[in-house]
UniProtKB/Swiss-Prot annotation:
UniProt protein name: Band 4.1-like protein 5
Origin species: Bos taurus
Protein encoded by which gene: EPB41L5
One Gene Ontology term from the biological process aspect of the record: actomyosin structure organization
Matches recorded under Pfam families: FA, FERM_C, FERM_M, FERM_N
Domain of life: Eukaryota
Length: 502
């Protein structure tokens, strides 16, 4: 009897405490979306949006991921939702995308409240295909975070232009009576922001007079899309030699990096199989041999954790389906050449082809652009011109070598660098790996010769122009292919110790 009362009272106290936690969490969030029905049978999900605000959503305990995603899209009034996803971290600090077909509680183990982040999942290969102004605005916010966190590297000149577009979109036209050069120091655009860069941004901002926020954001995206690592979803892997490599998922295929050097590209049409088992990822690629016959090559990579391996596999499946197919693969389809073994996972959303063909911009939409986070202003030691716009002579001091944090953008400076203040962003570190042993790379010449005829590119010299796009290949994807297919000279790929060649 006593044990019965203990269990009953204990459960009641736990329910009361959970209810208090939900209310407290809802008060902390900027927006609270209550659940319909019995309030005792709900879970609380807290979603951080790209503009820095939080939304607290109450859902039934057995709610699936799609229900939460639909609530967020309805809250934002976002039509082009297929480019976005909800991301969360597991107990092993592995990032995952919320699966809309599975229960939230079965995926997100840490909670309640269950904390997730709205992120761009698929970077459009052609931002001009984005129909809605709100979608372009969210893309700009995501790219700002990518650049600020260091995930997306950006040359000095490009960083200055993008930052100037940000100022134009947020502050409007430059006003001599209101704006001074010190104003730029209140914003954060890059991980290491020097005074020279802020002066260059200030001068560039003057040139964009007359652009509306929507025009400035469109120009921002059209500039950012040419960055080498734009839209590349990086995953750190290990080869059998123990060295770190990176696989980058793109609209055209899978890039392979050794450190920061691009050493190969597997085009999606040439990848015949992609499997995983525990923490081992297997990639099977076909290419033409000397007699013109197709020959299979198997590459094996390992990850630190089985969950990270499955996450990489799922991301590859989704990228292939979103950018390459006209429609998602049906579950009852017998064509399972690309997706094999035990997982039943299938990409169920719209493809980019469907999104660009079916979505139409609404005649009138309204949304609020939230101001960026401001920091304390600093006094510039070098004054900028506040009169007629002139060319700033920053580029006369460009150095060929980077020497310390002050030279991070290749600019020689005579004034001290004031580092950026702390910024809360989602950081995804790029790999830093030592070079592979020379004896592991003797096979490169033969592979490089084969690559000039096949569909996969490995080189000891500069690469030849990319191969023609397959039939029915979207034109904008082919354009993105041409941009990303290049590799640096003297590149190497891990030797036979790292790969199993069948």
């Amino acid at each position: 009897m006593l044990s019965f009362f203990r269990r009953t009272l204990g459960r009641r106290s736990m329910r009361k405490q959970a209810e208090k936690d939900r209310l407290r969490e809802a008060q902390r969030a900027a927006t609270h979306i209550p659940a319909a029905g019995d309030a005792r049978a709900v879970i609380t999900c807290r979603v951080s949006l790209l503009d820095g605000t939080d939304v607290s959503v109450d859902l039934p305990k057995k709610a699936k991921g799609q229900e939460l995603f639909d609530q967020i899209m309805y809250h934002l009034d976002l039509i082009e939702s297929d480019y976005f996803g909800l991301r969360f971290m597991d107990s092993a600090q592995v990032a995952h995308w919320l699966d809309g077909t599975k229960s939230i509680k079965k995926q997100v183990k840490i909670g309640s409240p269950y904390c997730l982040h709205l992120r761009v999942k698929f970077y459009s290969s052609e931002p001009n295909n984005l129909r809605e102004e709100l979608t372009r605005y969210l893309f700009v916010l995501q790219l700002k975070q990518d650049i600020l966190s260091g995930k997306l590297e950006c040359p000095f000149d490009t960083a200055v232009q993008l930052a100037a577009y940000n100022l134009q979109a947020e502050l409007g036209d430059y006003d001599l009576a209101e704006h001074s050069p010190e104003l730029v120091s209140e914003f954060r655009f890059v991980p290491i922001q020097t005074e020279e860069m802020e002066l260059a941004i200030f001068e560039k901002w003057k040139e964009y007079r007359g652009q509306t926020p929507a025009q400035a954001e469109t120009n921002y995206l059209n500039k950012a899309k040419w960055l080498e690592m734009y839209g590349v979803d990086m995953h750190v892997v290990k080869a059998r030699d123990g060295n770190d490599y990176s696989l980058g998922l793109t609209p055209t295929g899978v890039l392979v990096f050794e450190g920061e050097t691009k050493i190969g590209l597997f085009f999606w049409p040439k990848i015949t199989r992609l499997d995983f088992k525990k923490n081992k990822l297997t990639l099977v690629v076909v290419e033409d041999d000397d007699q013109g016959k197709e020959q299979e090559h198997t590459f094996v990579f390992r990850l630190d954790h089985p969950k990270a391996c499955k996450h990489l596999w799922k991301c590859a499946v989704e990228h292939h389906a979103f950018f390459r197919l006209r429609g998602p693969v049906q579950k009852n389809s017998h064509r399972s050449g690309f997706i094999r073994l035990g997982s039943r996972f299938r990409y169920s959303g719209k493809t980019e082809y469907q999104t660009t063909k079916t979505n139409k911009a609404r005649r009138s939409t309204s949304f609020e652009r939230r101001p960026s986070k401001r920091y304390s202003r600093r006094t510039l030691q070098v004054k900028a011109s506040t009169g007629k716009p002139e060319e700033l002579s920053v580029h006369n001091n460009v150095s060929a070598q980077s020497n310390g944090s002050q030279q991070a953008w290749g600019v020689r400076s005579t004034v001290p660098v004031i580092p950026s203040g702390p910024v809360v962003v989602e950081v995804e570190n790029l790999p830093k790996s030592p070079g592979a042993d020379q004896h592991d790379k003797k096979w490169l010449s033969a592979a490089g010769d084969r690559s000039q005829r096949g569909g996969n590119q490995w080189d000891t010299r500069a690469l030849s122009p990319p191969h023609p796009a397959p039939r029915n290949y979207p034109a904008f994807v082919h354009e993105h292919n041409v941009k990303n297919a290049g590799a640096q000279q003297n590149a190497h790929f891990p030797g036979p110790a790292a790969m199993t060649d069948i």
